[in-house]
A protein has these predicted regions:
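A detector for short, charged/polar N-terminal pre-domain segments
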Residues: 1-8
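N-terminal helix-turn-helix DNA-binding core of bacterial DNA-binding proteins
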Residues: 11-52
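Alpha-helical linker/hinge and terminal dimerization helices associated
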Residues: 16, 26, 63, 93-103
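Basic, amphipathic "hinge/linker" alpha-helix immediately C-terminal to the N-terminal HTH DNA-binding motif
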Residues: 21, 72-93
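Structured loop/turn residues at secondary-structure junctions
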Residues: 34, 84-85, 117
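Canonical helix-turn-helix DNA-binding module
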Residues: 39, 43-71, 75
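C-terminal regulatory/oligomerization modules of transcriptional regulators
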Residues: 94, 98-147
Length: 147
């Protein structure tokens, strides 16, 4: 089923979902943030059909989230690396993970957890204002501005 394009929508969330909202795309970005770079490794991790993975990677490259690069081991293979634009999705992936940890697992159920390498402890993503104060949705106002 085709969906309406949000490429000209004034809402940044709608435009973002138009680019990365297909769920395989975010899982590819998640794996790339975890160090996966080769097509076969993405396929193994995600269990995706080659054509679906190929389509997702192509779209991520076209929109500048990933790029094809020479293999890091010097072989003839091509790898996929996150661009700066792609690396900036890190807090989005962490926030989705955090929400899932809080709401989608039963007590005592096993799950993967991401820890801060320096401290070995879990961490939280929070929205803060310029003073470092934590904000909630009730603290926000939506206005239209020109870019």
């Amino acid at each position: 089923m085709r969906h309406k394009s949000f490429k000209t929508n004034a809402c940044p969330v709608a435009r973002s979902l138009d680019t990365i909202g297909e769920w395989w795309s975010l899982l590819v970005v998640r794996d790339a943030l975890g160090g996966i770079r080769r097509f076969s490794d993405f396929q193994k991790s995600l269990g995706l059909a080659k054509n679906v993975l190929s389509t997702r990677l192509k779209k991520l490259v076209e929109c500048g989230i990933m790029e094809q690069v020479s293999a890091s081991d010097g072989s003839a293979y091509r790898e996929y690396a996150l661009t700066q634009k792609g690396r900036e999705l890190f807090p989005v992936i962490v926030a989705l993970r955090q929400w899932g940890e809080s709401h989608l697992f039963s007590r005592g159920e096993k799950r993967l957890q991401v820890l801060d390498k320096r401290t070995g402890k879990p961490f939280r993503v929070e929205v803060q204002n310029a003073k470092g104060e934590v904000l909630t949705a009730d603290d926000l106002e939506l206005v239209t501005v020109k870019n």
